[in-house]
Regions:
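The conserved Walker
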Residues: 439, 451
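Hydrophobic positions on the alpha1 helix immediately C-terminal to the Walker A/P-loop
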Residues: 458
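Conserved lysine of the Walker
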Residues: 455
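P-loop NTPase motor domains
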Residues: 47, 54-72, 269-270, 364-365, ...
Length: 802
């Protein structure tokens, strides 16, 4: 405090730069202060705690305790910060130029407008490591240092600084390793468009200028002068931060005055969803363990002698002493402050009230800074320990509780495998979640949800948002739930019904080695649907039939014309087993056709209704073999997604199960991923392919299920907390659980009030009938039929309610 008085801190016209204390960059990723401290700043994405079990959180707390103790033993000092800033997912007026015209663009604009109306925040976590130049710790040495610095040869000073730098990097390396689960990143100078910017300086600028999000160009000049971008006016209870454009922000600071008797992992987690911007600053300066233990013993003796009734505190001190004597914990001087930031004074008062309550909920006593406000403000800057007035001794286990480094995942907005994020989802914390199917280059995804949970709407919404990538889409539908949507995005929709003409003819495939291999597998499947074995002689006959097929004129290539190659029909013969598939056979209308209706060059989107096919155990595998083969040979490396509704019913069979693992790898190499969806977790749990899908899928989505059994945990390796969330989330809220890598988040697609969009994304038997009548009368141009469809649906609903 005396330092500030000497510099006339209450003169509102003073130059703020002198209090920052940052001289410049010692190296690309290390700052140096005016008193020769070195600082390295590490940014953390944080640990996804919302769905983690308490046991896991406690384990991570113990690991952080060990890390903090190690840092303290190395004589490094620590600052940590949480910066909660407003984040608009989309800039004002943003229109995605890559979204196809029509329904995808219409939906995208409405979703962007909805997302832009909501006040969103993100949490940024930082840990700063501060190392003092050992060469100037000793007063005598400091005099020598000043003398050396005045001489042209300052070798001793530089050597001392080099050693300090090496010590800092050694500590930093250990911290980076300890915090690997928190996705650490060292802030450094970065090059953008031929200019160099200082990210460490930008971090400090956020603290000083009330979270201003500006770029700071790297300079060899005094960096403090370039950090200040606002005029700071310190009032009695608040700070006015005047911006260059004439606008102002207002800030007040809440601190811990007295600490509570206990701490726990995630003690500050509620701050992570507060509806205002803030900067939480903490500092930790280790002290001698023996001195700390002596103070604790003295405090304990006083409590005992005064017959203090707080027996639990006496016991806790004994436990802490035991842990200290065993070297399990260290001690240090700690401060914690919360700078609340708002755009007007009324909102600021509300924010301060919430912060006071939340700090008090830790079990301690909170205070709003007034006289001590300005020193605390400058004390937020890493290295400015001398400005801090409210410091108390805590142990490293307490420090690990106050610094859980928990966070809500943000996903990844840019630089994903396909580019920008697929879409932005709402979350329970008010932070946006940038959703991607891909984690690195793996995009395979599972979506699990019971009937009525919103699975169809979610699948179709995500598929619609993915159209920005101009990707090809192959959608295997059930009960025509996606038909309206697929037709709305100009898709070709085919109802695959074994009892009707399907228009498939695999024998018209071009004569290639790959197609010949497929035809042999396909024919083998046709002649063994009743479980008959395939002999070597059978394989030879089938191969002969394939050879014969390609000797025929293309117009004659069909099943009924190659059947004679298999010999005479009779019970149990190869020709007899093929008879059901051609001519007058029970399933002849599927494959024995003069032409093949499949032409994947006609469009980018194709839908196949599979409900009737799923009822026919004979036809399912041969038809899927053909469709998947046609899709596979059409893949050329352009972005492609395949959606399998009721995936387990489609592919969990002896034909596909053995090859699913290799198939997924091949698709990945061809820039293609699959979305596996199902409503029956029990069926999935009994499946031979579930283990493979869990290992090969990057993203898992679980919709609420009030009847979720323990099968969820065993089949999909969920934590107890994740299982609990799935069971307790209100299905009407449209929230769901997204798991990707080590991250998990509760998110939702809120389409309330967008009935015209929901009508398209969610097909039902009655709405599909309306669609059929509208298309029959007005044609299949979505621009024409969608408005008419919505109007007729509205009229139908009005009649129902009358």
């Amino acid at each position: 405090m005396s330092n500030l008085k000497e510099q006339k801190i209450f003169d509102n016209d003073y130059k703020s730069a002198k209090f920052i204390g940052i001289k410049g960059h010692w190296s690309n990723d290390v700052l140096i202060t005016h008193d020769n401290k070195l600082i390295q700043i590490i940014k953390l994405s944080g640990f996804s705690f919302e769905t983690a079990d308490d046991e896991d959180l406690d384990i991570k707390k113990d690991l952080r305790n060990s890390m903090f103790k190690g840092v303290g033993d190395s004589n490094a000092k620590i600052y940590t910060h949480i910066i909660r800033r407003k984040k608009v997912p989309y800039s004002p007026g943003y229109v995605n130029p890559d979204m196809p015209y029509g329904f995808p663009s219409y939906l995208d604009k409405k979703w962007i407008a909805r997302s832009s109306q909501k006040e969103s925040f993100i949490n940024e976590i930082y840990i700063s490591l501060i190392y003092k130049n050992s060469f100037i710790k000793n007063p005598v040495t400091e005099i020598q240092n000043q003398f050396l610095k005045k001489k042209s040869d300052n070798t001793a000073f530089l050597q001392a600084m080099h050693e300090t730098h090496e010590s800092l990097l050694e500590v930093s390396s250990r911290v980076m390793s300890s915090l690997r689960d928190y996705s650490p990143e060292i802030l450094s100078i970065e090059k953008v468009d031929e200019l160099y910017y200082s990210r460490p300086a930008e971090f400090i600028s956020d603290i000083v200028n009330g979270i201003d999000e500006r770029k700071i160009i790297y300079t060899t000049d005094d960096l403090s002068k370039h950090i200040v971008n606002s005029r700071l006016i310190f009032k009695k209870k608040y700070i006015e931060i005047k911006q260059h454009d004439g606008s102002s922000k207002f800030a007040s600071i809440v601190s811990i005055k007295e600490y509570g008797p206990k701490t726990w992992a995630g003690i500050l987690d509620n701050f992570l969803k507060m509806p205002f911007e803030f900067v939480i600053s903490q500092s930790y300066d280790s002290i001698n363990r023996q001195i700390a233990m002596s103070k604790m013993q003295l405090q304990q003796n006083r409590m005992i002698q005064s017959e203090d009734k707080a027996i639990s505190q006496v016991v806790e001190i004994s436990e802490a002493l035991d842990r200290a004597m065993s070297g399990e914990i260290g001690f240090g001087q700690h401060h914690l402050s919360v700078m609340c930031i708002e755009e007007n004074l009324k909102s600021l008062e509300n924010a301060v009230s919430m912060a006071l309550v939340e700090v008090s909920s830790t079990g301690g006593m909170s205070v709003r800074e007034k006289v001590n406000m300005e020193p605390t403000f400058w004390g937020q800057i890493p290295g400015n320990f001398h400005y801090l007035g409210r410091k108390s001794t805590i142990n490293t286990s307490n420090l690990a509780s106050f610094n859980s480094f928990h966070n809500y995942p943000l996903g990844k907005a840019h630089g994903n495998f396909w580019g920008d994020a697929v879409t932005v989802l709402d979350t329970t914390s008010g932070t946006p979640y940038y959703f991607n199917f891909h984690l690195r280059d793996i995009g395979h995804t599972t979506i699990i949800g019971p009937t009525g949970a919103g699975k169809t709407v979610l699948m179709n919404f995500l598929s619609a948002q993915a159209q920005k990538f101009r990707c090809r889409l192959f959608f295997f539908d059930k009960d025509r739930g996606a038909e309206i949507f697929l037709r709305a995005i100009n898709g070709k929709y085919t109802i695959v019904d074994p009892g009707k003409q399907c228009g498939f003819n695999p024998l018209l495939l071009p004569d290639t080695g790959e197609n010949r291999i497929f035809l042999l597998e396909w024919l083998k499947q046709l002649v063994s649907v009743l479980g008959e074995p395939i002999s070597a002689e059978d394989v030879a006959l089938l191969t002969s039939a394939i050879n014969g097929n390609y000797k025929l004129d293309p117009k004659n290539r069909k099943l009924s014309n190659i059947a004679p190659f298999l010999g005479l029909e009779g019970p149990g013969t190869l020709a007899g087993r093929l008879a059901m598939w051609h001519s007058n056979g029970s399933h002849a209308r599927i494959f024995d056709n003069d032409e093949d209706v499949i032409d994947f060059s006609q469009a980018n989107v194709f839908g196949f209704e599979m409900a009737e096919l799923l009822k026919d155990k004979f036809s399912l595998s041969p038809v899927l073999l053909y469709l998947f083969h046609r899709i596979s040979i059409s893949l050329d490396g352009s972005p492609t997604m395949i959606v399998l509704d009721e995936a387990w019913a489609l592919i969990d069979n002896p034909v596909f199960a053995p090859k699913i693992k290799d198939w997924l790898k091949v698709l990945r190499k061809l820039n293609t991923f699959i979305v596996f969806a199902t409503q029956s977790v029990e069926d999935a749990s009994k499946s031979a392919i579930s283990d493979t899908l869990i290992q090969q899928t990057a993203t898992q989505i679980f919709l609420p299920n009030l009847k979720a059994t323990s099968v969820y945990r065993t089949a999909f390796l969920l934590t107890e907390r994740e299982h609990h969330l799935i069971k307790t989330i209100d299905p009407g809220s449209r929230f769901f659980l997204v798991k990707q890598g080590i991250d998990a988040v509760v998110a939702r697609v809120d389409l309330s009030g967008m009935n015209d969009v929901i009508n398209v994304l969610s097909g039902r038997a009655d709405t599909v009938l309306i669609l059929e009548s509208v298309i029959k009368e007005y044609g299949d141009d979505p621009e024409v039929w969608i408005p008419i469809f919505n109007q007729k649906l509205k009229e139908s609903q009005n009649k129902t309610t009358e």
